[in-house]
């Protein structure tokens, strides 16, 4: 039971001991009060004066009353009020209420005449009734113990007392250096105005740079969404988070101290103070967005390492990882949201008078330790462990395929990309953690030094512990803000490649309008250049001609406007095998119709309907080609007679071998891709070009759009 009572008393009085230290009396040194019946006093007094020198200065306002002796008890009352009685048994003895009422009634006229402001702490209604007939005991050993008590006065630490201009109204939950209803000063308590201006400009510049980099990553994703699948997709969400973080710091740079600081109130004698708590709506919104997306960006990086580990270590496919996307989003957005709500409920919002934003843990070490430092350390540990496990798995795969030079080189490049990207993220983040740890260790020393430097200016007690003064360096805070922002730039490295440049070039090319007439001229010019180039090669290799391997290329240029899914002015080239030889300078113009966009032209002048079009970009499989050709061969044998008659009606002679040549042509598996829909082929021009026999056959390339 005694132990429980001791523990309860310790919990009750521990905050008082923290604020004012242990109780200690000290001898009176004020000359006017040295004639009193007591010679020991204790500070601070009822008015909050922390030593006798300040109390003596404040007593000078009441000297007219003492000099004119408006009341016989005026000096007794003033000494008991400003230099209170202190005994080892009763501790502090304030003046009695009856004494206060008698002195105030006797001196009221002089108080009004001289305009003396009566302190609120000395209002008689606040004092208690006491028995003044009890004499104050005088200890004869007091003079002998005087020097010892004076030594205790020098070493006594009564803790931090909040200056008057930093006090806040009740109910807002402000707390500074362990004192309730007290707020930090604004501008920053550690740095000068010129240093703060330089730091704000630096933070604003870095935030703009990081914002541009992260937006570039996100816009690259929007250009080609299918390019970034899992396990790489978290990089995009990671970039979005840090783009919001950069935007918040840029907004703080524009707002200055208007959001992070409270304006001074001259009527209440309050100075500029830092915003603490969630009463300021603008500061609360900045805090919610900044803290939420800072934590979310870190969690998305951890999820990125998880997806890499599943792909490299567990051999999961992209589709299998993508099925877990809902859980990834739940963790990435749910965890920061939960922490943000907890901080709002605990009223831990704090204004940052360096960057202009609002965050957590700037003045509260516990909040910084549990809501910033601990989550970041946990994310770094988990992410680094999974990253190392994935790299070890990839290295094992590289050793297995060491005889496959091409795949081994690709895997090596991929591992290098992962290593560089992880380094660009981990190095700034670990540096940021180092800044937070260093601040945790030295924050108390910085605060004691600040109190020691400004205690006389603010008329508050000066701490005696400040023997080795230490002040924070501006470079430390600038590194902390730099590492906070530069973490998001690492995503640019992952998307920075030749393919990204090609995608951006194609994006601007598709969005640039072209003149239809100029485009038609350009198409015709390219066709002529192509014909002349390949015709010269045919002349050069005329002697080496083989009828069974000769090929023709047909280039179709559409000058109309297509309403279909394919692009206008499309270009398609097909290789057609023939067994006869055409003239080297023969140029045949083929008029297309809505039914057929192209015809396969044979060397003897006969034309046959083209084969089925092949899908864009997808090469035909062997099984599909054989089944398709077997069906088409029957149709072509039945239509051989009609084809010959059609050729004769157009003024061309069809040899008897047309039917057999048709079968031979089908065996070559020729496919003619169409450049546009049939409705857009009116007025199109087809050019028949003689290429050399060694020209390479193009497959599946007819859907490429020039626009």
From Swiss-Prot:
What organism is this sequence from?
Answer: Pongo abelii
Protein name (Swiss-Prot/TrEMBL): Frizzled-6
Give the family from UniProt.
Answer: Belongs to the G-protein coupled receptor Fz/Smo family.
One biological process term in Gene Ontology:
canonical Wnt signaling pathway
Q: Which residue spans belong to the Extracellular compartment?
A: 20-202, 256-285, 347-371, 439-474
Q: Which InterPro entries match?
A: Frizzled/SFRP (IPR015526), Frizzled/Smoothened_7TM (IPR000539), Frizzled_dom (IPR020067), Frizzled_dom_sf (IPR036790), FZ6_CRD (IPR041770), FZD6_7TM (IPR026543), GPCR_2-like_7TM (IPR017981)
* Gene name of this polypeptide: FZD6
Domain of life, per lineage: Eukaryota
Predominant subcellular localization, coarse grouping: membrane
Spans of biased composition, class Basic and acidic residues? 647-659, 695-707
Q: Which residues lie on this side of the membrane: Cytoplasmic?
A: 224-234, 307-325, 393-417, 496-707
List S-S links within the chain. Answer: 25-86, 33-79, 70-107, 96-130, 100-124
The residue ranges flagged as biased composition, category Low complexity, are 674-686
Glycosylation sites per record: 39, 353
- Residues with the modification Phosphoserine, per the entry, are 654
Q: Give a Gene Ontology cellular component term annotated to this protein.
A: apical plasma membrane
């Amino acid at each position: 039971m005694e132990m429980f009572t001791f523990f309860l008393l310790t919990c009750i009085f521990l905050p008082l001991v923290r604020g004012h230290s242990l109780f200690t009396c000290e001898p009176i040194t004020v000359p006017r009060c040295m004639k009193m019946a007591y010679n020991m006093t204790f500070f601070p007094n009822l008015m909050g004066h922390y030593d006798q020198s300040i109390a003596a200065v404040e007593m000078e306002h009441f000297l007219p009353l003492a000099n004119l002796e408006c009341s016989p008890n005026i000096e007794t009352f003033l000494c008991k009020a400003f230099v209170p009685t202190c005994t080892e048994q009763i501790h502090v003895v304030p003046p009695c209420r009856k004494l206060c009422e008698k002195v105030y009634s006797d001196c009221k006229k002089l108080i009004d005449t001289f305009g003396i402001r009566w302190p609120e702490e000395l209002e008689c209604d606040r004092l208690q009734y006491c028995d003044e007939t009890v004499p104050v005991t005088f200890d004869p050993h007091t003079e002998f113990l005087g020097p010892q008590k004076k030594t205790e006065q020098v070493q006594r630490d009564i803790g931090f007392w909040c200056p008057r201009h930093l006090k806040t109204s009740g109910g807002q939950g402000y707390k500074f250096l362990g004192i309730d209803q007290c707020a930090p000063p604004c501008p920053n308590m550690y740095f000068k105005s010129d240093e703060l201006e330089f730091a704000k400009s630096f933070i604003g510049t870095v935030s703009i740079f990081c914002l541009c980099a992260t937006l570039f990553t996100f816009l690259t994703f929007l250009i080609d969404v299918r390019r970034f699948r899992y396990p790489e997709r978290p990089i995009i969400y990671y970039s979005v988070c840090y783009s919001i973080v950069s935007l918040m710091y840029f907004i703080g740079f524009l707002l200055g101290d208007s959001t992070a600081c409270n304006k001074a109130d001259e009527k209440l004698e309050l100075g500029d103070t830092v915003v603490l708590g969630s009463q300021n709506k603008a500061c609360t919104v900045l805090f919610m967005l900044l803290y939420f997306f800072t934590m979310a960006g870190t969690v998305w990086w951890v999820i990125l390492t998880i997806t890499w580990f599943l792909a490299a270590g567990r051999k999961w496919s992209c589709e299998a990882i993508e099925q877990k996307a809902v859980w990834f989003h739940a963790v990435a957005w749910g965890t920061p949201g939960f922490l943000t709500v907890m901080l709002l409920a605990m009223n831990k919002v704090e204004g940052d008078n360096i960057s202009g934003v609002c965050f957590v843990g700037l003045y509260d070490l516990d909040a910084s330790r549990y809501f910033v430092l601990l989550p970041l350390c946990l994310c770094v540990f988990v992410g680094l462990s999974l990253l190392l496990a994935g790299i070890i798995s990839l290295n094992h795969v590289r050793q297995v395929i060491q005889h496959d030079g091409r795949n081994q080189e690709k895997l090596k490049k991929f591992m290098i990309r992962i290593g560089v990207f992880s380094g660009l993220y981990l190095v700034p983040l670990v540096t940021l953690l180092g800044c937070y740890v260093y601040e945790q260790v030295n924050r108390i020393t910085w605060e004691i030094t600040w109190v020691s430097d400004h205690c006389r200016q603010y008329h508050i007690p000066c701490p005696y512990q400040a023997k080795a003064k230490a002040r924070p360096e501006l470079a430390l805070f600038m590194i902390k803000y730099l590492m906070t922002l530069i973490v998001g730039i690492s995503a640019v490295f992952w998307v920075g490649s030749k393919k990204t440049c090609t995608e951006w070039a194609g994006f601007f090319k598709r969005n640039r309008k072209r003149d239809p007439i100029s485009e038609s001229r350009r198409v015709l010019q390219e066709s002529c250049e192509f014909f002349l180039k390949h015709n010269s090669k045919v002349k050069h290799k005329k002697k080496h001609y083989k009828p069974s391997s000769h090929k023709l290329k047909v280039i179709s240029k559409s000058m109309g406007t297509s309403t279909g899914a394919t692009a206008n002015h499309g270009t398609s080239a097909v290789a057609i095998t023939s067994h006869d030889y055409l003239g080297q300078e023969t140029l045949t113009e083929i008029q297309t119709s809505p039914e057929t966009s192209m015809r396969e032209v044979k060397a003897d002048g006969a034309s046959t309907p083209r084969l089925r079009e092949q899908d864009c970009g997808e090469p035909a499989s062997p099984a599909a080609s054989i089944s398709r050709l077997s069906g088409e061969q029957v149709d072509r044998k039945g239509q051989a007679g009609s084809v010959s008659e059609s050729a004769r009606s157009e003024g061309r002679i069809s040899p008897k071998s047309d039917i057999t040549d048709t079968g031979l042509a089908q065996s070559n598996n020729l496919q003619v891709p169409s450049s546009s829909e049939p409705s857009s082929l009116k007025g199109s021009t087809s050019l028949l070009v003689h290429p050399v026999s060694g020209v390479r056959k193009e497959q599946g390339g007819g859907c490429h759009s020039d626009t």
